[in-house]
């Protein structure tokens, strides 16, 4: 979504 901090893919 916005940033891949919680879910890389």
Swiss-Prot record:
Intrachain S-S bonds: none
Main localisation: secreted
Expression tissues: Chorionic epithelium (trophectoderm) and placental cotyledons.
EC number: 3.4.23.-
Record keywords: Aspartyl protease, Glycoprotein, Hydrolase, Protease, Secreted
Domain of life per record: Eukaryota
Positions annotated as glycosylated: 4
GO cellular component, one term: extracellular region
GO MF annotations in UniProt: aspartic-type endopeptidase activity
Cell compartments where the protein resides: Secreted, Extracellular space
GO biological process: proteolysis
Note: On the 2D-gel the determined pI of this protein is: 5.4, its MW is: 55 kDa.
Sequence similarity: Belongs to the peptidase A1 family.
Protein name: Pregnancy-associated glycoprotein 55B
Organism: Bison bonasus (European bison)
Classification lineage: Eukaryota, Metazoa, Chordata, Craniata, Vertebrata
């Amino acid at each position: 979504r916005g940033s891949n901090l919680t879910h890389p893919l």
